[in-house]
Swiss-Prot record:
One of its GO terms (molecular function) is ATP binding. Residues 860-911 form the FHA domain. The lineage of its organism: Eukaryota, Metazoa, Chordata, Craniata, Vertebrata. Pfam families: 4HB_KIF14, FHA, Kinesin, Kinesin_assoc. This is Kinesin-like protein KIF14. It comes from the Eukaryota. Directly interacts with PRC1 within a complex also containing KIF4A, KIF20A and KIF23; targets to the central spindle. Directly interacts with CIT depending on the activation state of the kinase (stronger interaction with the kinase-dead form); targets to the midbody. Interacts with ARRB2; the interaction is detected in the nucleus upon OR1D2 stimulation. Interacts with AKT1; the interaction is detected in the plasma membrane upon INS stimulation and promotes AKT1 phosphorylation. Interacts with SVIL; at midbody during cytokinesis. Residues 132-158, 171-374, 1618-1674 are annotated as: Disordered.
Length: 1674
């Protein structure tokens, strides 16, 4: 008996032996016990003592299927027999007998004889999504002798082992089987399988000389075969134990060389095979990438064990092993990692995999079925399961571009080099060499290089494999990354003559569709194109928004299944490559249109081009066609380039764009870094949502996608830092592992499985001789339920087809509409080469000359783009007038005529009269639209004006830079005058500020002088009084001579005291006079300094005026392009302010300080007399918001655009007369920075006065900072005490969050009024600040705390309630009101602090208005959410504020009206939904009619309640009526919820699903009860309000209850036992879930009922009448 491997050309090879041969074969293989050899192809493990494994360098584990020939002699030819006798089949294990009722029944009966059949094993190898094919090994495919193997010798060892000699066998011309010695792995088959033996005596020729020599040398070659029941080894997905059809391919190779022949001997090993073996582990896919499209292995197709001269024989020691009952899968060989790139992978066609139902019902394939039915079932069960899942790393390619023109001019040095797949970067400064290895490296530096990578090479190598994977059903993504100017857009889009990846991809896509599309396979494609700019998403395939408005940025959302998506993005159906070309052209021109008007978009954005391909495969089952859909999403992303601000010299809007781009790319880098760490086994957070770009690419990075990345780099040394950063970026991206799976339509998959199940059940039904009637009845019920599901899915498929057609028609209509709209905006798809035209010029070269405006014969009008505009050329922009200009074309002469004051420039010159245009002229409209005029006829005739020869022929191309410099040169004088005017105005304002400061100082010094003079007079008067008192005392002393002696001592004492007081007064008088003298000297010095400063400024003003008068002199200030842009932007801001009738004026402000000029924008509020200054960056951002407001024609946030609460407003001194200055006004002007800058040398009067005051005149001075330090702790202490008291209070007064919101709004209202009143009552001549008072400080802190609590409570309130109808809009309104309230509070406090009365009054009015709006919104939301307002019951707090209470009442009544409107709409929708349901039985028709009538009656009742509520709202209601409305709202919400639940149960019953009668009865009773109560309450409410409306008759309420009873009766008839039980048997799980949800919902509004099945157990149904009525429903 000889042992060898067997191969066949056919998928199923038959083995033919006789009965005696089988006995001898089995007994020859049994050692001491009678063990049977289990023939099973599975992955096995080599022994640890194998030198090839120990060396770690030679081979891998290979599955081997051994064929043992039952011959008496070694070289005996096997006996041939009938191939139909025996075939190898898989015996199903007990773990497979669990799928269905029939399957479990049939699985218990198994035949004793299981036929055996050897089948061809197919395999698959994976390497980055690529398939590889080896050269064929066999000879002529048609030759039978080519399939014979070389001779095999078997040697006996101790009479119980067999040694295998080298064998070569070939399956077909496409398979090569090369392997080494293997231990047989643990089989998975049954224990009673038979083994047949066969011997082959031929050798197959090989394809190459090396392989031929290796085979002739006699080395071991084993070809693997595997039956259908094999488990997967690699590249697939494991399922249950014993799954059928999971086949894979293993790598095979040869040992040896052409010099020697080394026999390799192995010993068969006996093992106990487990009954249930777990599937072996997956081994890494071993393959090599394609080599320029050739199927040649990269490192050869043979293995060598030692050297090419000699080989050492290797023997495997015979060994007996006991295998456990449940064996573990063998471990992976360590040699796999070292042989990944050195093993040739055969390309084989994967065999279809068995479906899910085939796995579950394996036990049902028995011999009891007829042969034709058995074959049909087997054919059905072997359908492929396309839900494949693969782990694949991101493929990274790097492309090196050539030098640019600038780099060639600068003679840049090359620092980037390639060597195969390795890229090296030589740093010129650090003298270091950096090496990087990627999957693919494209060298596009030199076209003469033999390895030059063209656009075709890049596409075929990188993008074409992604297209193949897309056809397999995987999502794919390709994105390009690199610095600005590295060639990303050229790689992705390309040029007309050299198209890039996207055009080639689309063209190849439709080419393959044309080849693959048949009558059974159809393809549908949809495309979208959008950009991400400054974290905003813009659809590039839509011209304008709804109702002709400006289209708004889109928002990103996330679907729980399909992942992130763009809400509202247009998806257009495309049927050919020309459609995609037109849409791409439209999208690119949309970008150009957007970038022309200097608005918030430009070409510096991330663009995402998406294709959604749906493959529909038609399957015919039982004569019916069913569709199976596979969807693939293809994302082609062109990322914006990263840049360094210092290198790009960007500023302003460009700087902001760069910051946004770098931010999104930084987030992308963080995501890639986190994913690379996650691939290494770490658990990290992936910040997808930090950027819009990464959120949208979530599935492409670490998700369900096959992703490739191409990094473009510059080879120049000047960009080495960016190059290294890009390469490191790409290196991290290689570590990302995606989990890609085939996107199969689950409905189609379910249809296929249901069809297979039906076929199986029908086959079982026809052979029911061994099945009892009870199981037969259950099978019929299952068939009926499956038919129901199948027909429902078919209806869904028909609906999907209809939607597809509608979407295609809408896409065509939209395309025509967009084309017409874009023709007016300059996007011309067809042009006449003889007509004159205008082409756009843009700062971005890629967007220049993208828009073409044809100038027709006659008059062409140009104006603003509006929905009602009829102009031939429509432009957008603030400075574009409604009727801007007209272009006349008569007789080949074209002239342009400006209209009114619209700004029109020709060759940089502002024109105000008709001007003739010539070929090449530059036309600028509105200051920001640049065009070049083309006249083909004039060029052909060679017309040239002599006056323009020097201008047109001596200069370069007329691009944007040329037009910009030309306009700047022509407008230089105007810009210089504007700059000088700004500087002159700034100097004049400075002089005015100095004059005001001088007069204020004069006033302060005069008042201080008067104070000192009064003090001196008081001291002199006191001195005189003291002298007079002394004289009187002396006279008294003389008169009282008799008391002289007694008073002598008193006299002396008095004399001393008088002397001391006199001396003191003299000293104080002298000090006061000295201080007055010092003050006069200081006053003189200050006035002298101010006068000198005034003269200096006057001289500068005079010099500026002289310069302005003398235009021929050279100016010191040279205007640049930024000055020109700033001038245009200021004009736009003033135009927008004027349109909205705002009192804001914008102007340029140039302040020179120590020779350094500081430019800013001054914002003046003429109404309030205040001004502030904006930096250029802030002005640009504000202008962008103004333009957005301008395009949307205003809105609620128009005031926020012009007035920023964070601005530091100050009094405007330009219109302030000095004579009207009061002390309070002077104090506010002192805070003006120009005035305070002039008075920085003057100390505060209080401190000077306190420094010289002493004695009797000394008084404590109060300074604000000191007082605040003393007051603030006490105020905080009181607030903490009030908070502690609040803890001890009961919650009777404040039970809901709505009450807390209203109380905080009331606190804000009262606090603002109190602070405003204190500000008004402040003395005009007082020098104290308002907030030096303790009460004002306390009020301010209370206002701040109340606003903080308001914000916190609002956020909590939104999270406590589920969204209801109409609440989303009110919540947004309330959020905006609170935001505005905070801004106006900031302005109010700033006005109080700055003592600007106009600002305080304006802010107070705004605050009061916003508070009333917020209170009204809270009232409406309280009604819609069913909240109570206890503040209405305890109205003592709000009784004093009538406006506040009126707003709350208006909100409650408006909310009630909205609630009734939503209830009416809900009832109408439910009635329409019921009308759309189909009913085929009489019972269901009656149920449907009763339900529709009942809902209609309830709808009429709601309409009547709405009418009464509206009448009540028109009258003035009391607080009690408002509280009554709130209670009515809560009851109405319960009624609405019960109505929805009831209709859902009835609709479910009409569709054939089970429902609970008890829950339905409870809901209907609750609805009738609530309707009766609401009717009486609304009637009483209307009567109390004085409304005289018609009441709903009581008969109508009774009719509502009667209809409800009729509905319940119909429902009971429909749920009778004979009709309901078949549904209960097939849908028990869904019924239990429905009952649980119904019971939970009914518990909210009615009594709890037990949701149990109605009726007793269903009697057995005979086979003759199995639920005929239910079948009619299908």
């Amino acid at each position: 008996m000889s042992v060898h491997t067997s191969h066949s050309r056919h998928n199923i090879g038959s083995l033919e032996v006789s009965s005696s041969q089988k006995i001898s074969a089995s007994s020859g293989l049994v050692h001491s016990s009678r063990l049977e050899l289990h023939l099973k192809a599975d992955m096995s493990e080599c022994e640890n003592h194998d030198p090839f494994v120990n060396a770690g360098s030679k081979t891998i584990d290979i599955n081997s299927t051994y064929v043992i020939s039952a011959c008496k002699k070694t070289r005996e030819t096997p006996v041939t027999s009938d191939p139909r006798r025996l075939s190898l089949q898989r015996r199903a294990t007990c773990g497979d007998r669990e799928s269905s009722l029939l399957g479990s029944e049939l699985g218990n009966r198994r035949t004793a004889d299981t036929s055996l059949r050897l089948q061809r094993r197919h395999g698959r190898a994976d390497y980055v999504g690529k398939w590889e094919t080896l050269n064929p090994v066999g000879g002529n495919p048609g030759s039978d002798s080519a399939s014979q193997a070389s001779r095999t010798e078997a040697k006996g060892v101790n009479n119980d082992t067999r040694v295998l000699s080298s064998v070569v066998s070939v399956k077909d011309s496409n398979d090569t089987g090369l392997t080494r010695c293997k231990d047989p792995g643990p089989p998975v088959g049954a224990s009673n399988e038979k083994v047949t033996v066969k011997d082959t005596n031929s050798r197959a020729p090989v394809g190459s000389q090396r392989q031929t020599e290796a085979m002739r040398s006699g080395h071991l070659v084993v070809q693997l075969t595997e039956s259908k029941s094999d488990t997967p080894v690699s590249g697939g997905r494991n399922s249950h134990r014993g799954n059928a059809g999971k086949d894979t391919a293993k790598q095979v190779g040869t040992f040896g060389s052409s010099d020697t022949r080394t026999p390799v001997k192995c010993v068969l090993e006996h093992r106990w095979t487990p009954r249930h073996d777990p599937p072996p582990p997956k081994s890494p896919a071993l393959s090599t990438p394609k080599n320029n499209g050739k199927d040649i292995p990269k490192h050869g197709s043979t293995f060598r064990s030692a050297s090419s001269e000699s080989r050492t024989p290797v023997k495997c020691v015979p060994e007996h092993r006991w295998t456990p009952r449940h064996d573990l899968p063998p471990p992976k060989s360590p040699a796999l990692s070292t042989l990944k790139n050195r093993i040739a992978s055969p390309r084989v066609k994967p065999r279809p995999k068995s479906s899910l139902f085939a796995n579950k019902r394996e036990s049902s394939r028995e011999s009891t079925l007829p042969p034709e039915e058995n074959s049909l079932v087997q054919k059905t069960f072997t359908e492929p399961d396309s839900l494949k899942v693969e782990n694949s790393q991101v493929t990274v390619a790097v492309r090196v571009r050539p030098f640019s023109k600038r780099e060639k001019t600068e003679k840049a040095s090359q620092v980037v080099f390639t060597n195969g797949e390795e890229i090296t970067v030589e740093h010129p400064d650090m003298k270091q060499v950096y090496s990087f290895i990627y999957d693919v490296s494209f060298w596009s530096f030199d076209e003469c290089h033999p390895g030059y990578a063209s656009q075709t090479t890049v596409y075929e190598t990188l993008a074409a494999p992604l297209l193949d994977r897309a056809f397999e059903g995987y999502n794919t993504c390709l994105f390009a990354y690199g610095q600005t100017g590295s060639g990303k857009s050229y790689t992705m889009m390309g040029l007309n003559e050299e198209p890039g990846i996207i055009p080639r991809f689309c063209e190849d896509l439709f080419a393959q569709i044309a080849k693959k599309q048949t009558s059974e396979v159809s393809y549908h494609l949809e495309m979208s194109f959008f950009e991400v700019y400054n974290e905003k998403i813009h659809d590039l395939l839509v011209c304008k928004g709804e109702n002709g408005q400006r289209k708004q940025p889109l928002r990103a959302r996330e679907h729980p299944v399909s992942g992130p998506y763009v809400e509202g993005l247009s998806m257009n159906v495309v049927s050919s490559y020309s459609d995609i070309q037109s849409w791409l052209e439209l999208g690119n021109k949309q970008r150009a249109t957007a970038a022309t008007g200097m608005n918030d978009k430009s070409s510096r954005s991330h663009s995402v081009f998406t294709l959604v391909m749906t493959q529909t495969k038609t399957e015919v089952v039982e004569g019916e066609e069913h569709d199976h859909r596979i969807t693939s999403r293809i994302n082609l992303v062109d990322l914006a380039g990263s840049e360094r601000c210092s290198t790009a010299h960007s500023s302003g809007q460009r700087l902001k764009e760069g910051v946004s781009i770098n931010k999104s790319l930084l987030t992308l880098g963080k995501v890639i870094s986190a994913l690379s760490e996650q691939a290494n086994g770490k658990r990290v957070f992936i910040p997808y949502r930090e950027s819009t770009l990464t959120w949208l690419l979530k599935e492409s990075l670490g998700g369900n996608s096959k992703t490739a990345m191409i990094a473009t780099v510059s080879p120049a040394a000047s960009n080495i830092e960016e190059t290294l950063s890009t390469l490191r970026y790409a290196t991290q991206a290689r570590l990302i592992v995606n989990i890609a799976k085939v996107n199969e339509d689950m409905n189609a998959k379910l249809i296929r499985e249901l069809k297979a199940e039906i076929e199986k059940l029908k086959a079982a039904q026809r052979s029911n001789r061994n099945i009892d009637p009870e199981r037969y009845r259950l099978c019929r019920q299952e068939i009926t339920s499956l038919r129901m599901k199948l027909h429902q899915q078919e209806r869904d498929m028909a609906e999907i087809q209809r939607v597809w057609k509608e979407k295609f028609e809408q896409a065509e209509k939209r395309k025509l509409q967009e084309t017409k709209e874009l023709q007016k905006a300059g996007v011309t798809f067809q042009m006449d080469n003889h007509l004159p035209n205008l082409v756009n010029l843009n700062e971005d070269p890629q967007l220049s000359e993208m828009l073409l405006y044809m100038v027709k014969e006659g008059v062409t009008t140009v104006g603003k783009h509006t929905p009602s505009s009829s102009h031939d050329i429509q432009l957008s922009g603030v400075l574009i007038a409604d009727d801007h200009c007209t272009i006349r074309n008569f007789g080949g002469t074209v002239s342009i005529v400006p209209a009114g004051e619209a700004k029109t420039y020709v060759n940089g010159t502002h024109i105000s009269e008709p001007t003739v245009l010539h070929h090449g002229d530059r036309v600028v409209l509105g200051g920001d639209h640049y065009f070049r005029f083309n006249h083909p006829v004039e060029v052909q005739k060679g017309k040239k004006l002599s006056s323009r020869n020097n201008l047109t022929t001596s200069e370069g191309p007329k691009d944007f830079e040329f037009a910009k410099n030309e306009l700047l040169t022509a407008q230089r004088s105007r810009l210089e005058a504007e700059i000088k005017d700004a500087q002159l105005k700034a100097k004049e304002e400075m002089m005015q500020g100095i004059q005001i400061a001088k007069e204020m100082a004069q006033q302060e010094l005069s008042s201080q002088k008067a104070v000192y003079e009064r003090k001196i007079q008081a001291l002199e008067a006191e001195l005189r009084e003291e002298s007079q008192r002394k004289r009187l005392e002396e006279l008294n002393n003389q008169k009282a001579s008799h008391k002289i002696e007694e008073l002598e001592r008193a006299k002396q004492h008095l004399e001393q005291e008088v002397y001391v007081n006199k001396r003191r007064l003299e000293m104080e008088t002298l000090a006061t006079k000295q201080a007055l003298e010092d003050h006069r000297i200081r006053h003189a010095r200050i006035l002298e300094a101010l006068e000198i400063e005034k003269q200096k400024i006057a001289e500068e003003v005079q010099m500026l005026q002289e310069n302005r008068g003398n235009r021929d002199k050279t100016f010191t200030i040279q205007p640049n392009w930024n000055s020109m842009k700033l001038s245009t932007m200021i004009q736009e801001a003033n135009a927008i302010s004027d349109k909205f009738k705002k009192c804001y004026i914008f102007g340029r402000h140039d302040a020179s300080d120590k020779g350094r000029s500081d430019t800013s924008v001054r914002v003046r509020n003429l109404q309030l007399g205040i001004s502030t200054f904006w930096s250029l960056e802030k002005f640009e951002s504000k202008l962008a918001a103004m333009k957005e407001l301008y395009e949307s024609n205003g809105g609620d946030r128009d005031e926020d655009v012009f007035c920023d609460p964070a601005d530091e407003w100050e009094p405007d001194i330009t219109s302030t007369p000095v004579s009207s200055l009061s002390r309070r006004r002077s104090r506010s002007l002192m805070k003006n920075r120009r005035v305070s800058g002039c008075l920085h040398d003057i100390h505060p009067i209080q401190s000077m006065q306190s420094s010289h005051s002493s004695g009797l005149m000394e008084k404590p001075s109060t300074i604000y900072s000191n007082s605040s330090e003393s007051f603030l702790p006490g105020i905080c202490k009181e607030l903490i005490g009030s908070s502690i008291d609040f803890l001890g209070q009961s919650f009777d007064e404040e039970k809901t969050i709505a009450d807390s919101l209203i109380n905080n709004l009331l606190r804000l209202h009262n606090g603002v009024i109190a602070i405003s009143k204190a500000h008004e009552e402040q003395d005009e001549e007082s020098q104290d600040n308002l907030f030096s008072d303790r009460a004002a400080q306390a009020l301010t802190i209370q206002v701040a705390c109340a606003f903080e609590q308001l914000v916190v409570l609002f956020k909590h309130w939104l999270g406590d309630f589920l969204p209801c109808t109409g609440s989303a809009r009110l919540e947004d309104e309330l959020r905006q009101d609170i935001k505005k309230l905070g801004g106006y509070l900031q302005l109010f406090l700033q006005g109080c602090c700055s003592d600007i009365s106009s600002m305080v009054k304006e802010a107070q009015n705004k605050v009061m208005k916003i508070i009333q709006q917020a209170v009204q919104c809270v009232g409406q939301l309280a009604v819609l959410k069913g909240s109570k307002l206890c503040v209405l019951e305890n109205s003592s707090k709000v009784s004093s504020t009538q406006e506040f209470m009126a707003a709350l009442q208006d909100g409650v009544t408006s909310g009630m009206k909205s609630l009734l409107d939503s209830g009416l709409e809900t009832a109408q929708d439910l009635r329409q939904d019921l009308s759309r349901q189909s009913a085929r039985e009489e019972v269901t028709k009656q149920m449907k009619a009763s339900t529709v009538e009942w809902v209609g009656s309830l709808e009429n009742a709601v309409a009547e309640w709405r009418t009464k509520s509206f009448r009540t709202q028109a009258q003035e209601g009391s607080r009690q009526q408002v509280s009554k409305l709130l209670s009515l709202a809560s009851e109405f919400l319960k009624l609405k919820s019960c109505l929805q639940q009831t209709v859902e149960m009835i609709v479910s019953a009409l569709r054939g699903c089970p429902s609970d009668l008890h829950c339905l009865r409870s809901c209907t009773e609750t609805i009738c009860s609530l309707a009766r109560k609401l009717h009486s309450d609304f009637s009483a409410h209307s009567a109390s309000a004085g409304s005289c409306g018609n009441e709903l008759p009581r008969a109508d309420c009774e009719e509502l209850e009667s209809l409800a009873k009729s509905l319940l009766l119909c429902f009971e008839c429909g749920e009778s036992p004979g009709l309901s039980k078949p549904w209960e048997s097939c849908s028990s799980n869904s019924k239990e879930e429905q009952c649980k949800s119904d019971r939970a919902d009914c518990g909210k509004s009615g009594p709890r009922r037990a949701c149990e099945p109605h009726g007793d157990a269903t009697p057995a149904v005979s086979s003759g009448d199995c639920t005929p009525n239910r079948i009619q429903w299908v």
